[in-house]
Swiss-Prot record:
HAMAP family for this protein: UreE
Entry GO MF terms: nickel cation binding; unfolded protein binding
Subcellular location: Cytoplasm
SUPFAM superfamilies to which the protein is assigned, alphabetical: Urease metallochaperone UreE, C-terminal domain, Urease metallochaperone UreE, N-terminal domain
Name of protein: Urease accessory protein UreE
Recorded family membership: Belongs to the UreE family.
Species annotation: Corynebacterium glutamicum (strain ATCC 13032 / DSM 20300 / JCM 1318 / BCRC 11384 / CCUG 27702 / LMG 3730 / NBRC 12168 / NCIMB 10025 / NRRL B-2784 / 534)
Alphabetical UniProt keywords: Chaperone, Cytoplasm, Nickel, Nickel insertion
Length: 157
């Protein structure tokens, strides 16, 4: 079966799953924006994704396939990340500048979203841990599903 569009998300339309079993199909963060891919459903059946150009990134709860009894939905595998919580604006600037020079994709959270303080979120990297430890910058290693997949962007000097 070839899927060309995602029309429903169970979090947008929870009534869609009433009376049906919901089965997650696991995706890594790195493939959520790939338009063309093959995925294996639990039980061995394969689905092909051939989404149109400009299709939004796959997100948690997108319905891949449904019948009268079962709904197969996107389930995003949590990513190993560092949640960095600098003590002040100076330390935040230092961290952002230093990690930015490494061209690491980063995301940011507001106070109260992930931690009490604003945070910078990067994918786990042992060299980043060494840098943070060396400079006494507070961080926590955890797994989470980021709201937007981490992506390396093109870069030139």
């Amino acid at each position: 079966m070839i899927i060309t569009a995602i029309d429903t998300n169970i979090y947008d339309q929870p009534e869609f799953v009433e009376g049906r079993d919901v089965i997650g199909v696991r995706f890594e963060d790195l493939v959520l924006d790939k338009r063309i891919q093959r995925v294996a459903l639990p039980g061995g059946e394969e689905l092909g994704l051939r989404l149109n150009h400009g299709h939004p990134i796959l997100r948690e709860g997108d319905v891949l396939k449904a019948d009268d009894k079962t709904v197969f939905v996107v389930e995003i595998i949590p990513t190993d990340v560092l949640v960095i919580t600098p003590s002040d604006i100076h330390q935040m600037g230092f961290v952002a500048h230093s990690l930015g020079n490494r061209h690491l994709p980063a995301q940011f959270s507001k106070p109260g979203e992930l931690t009490e303080k604003a945070a910078m979120i990067v994918q786990y990297d042992h060299t980043v841990v060494s840098f943070l430890d060396e400079h006494g910058i507070e961080y926590q290693r955890t797994e989470l599903v980021p709201p937007i997949p981490f992506r390396h962007s093109g870069h030139t000097h």
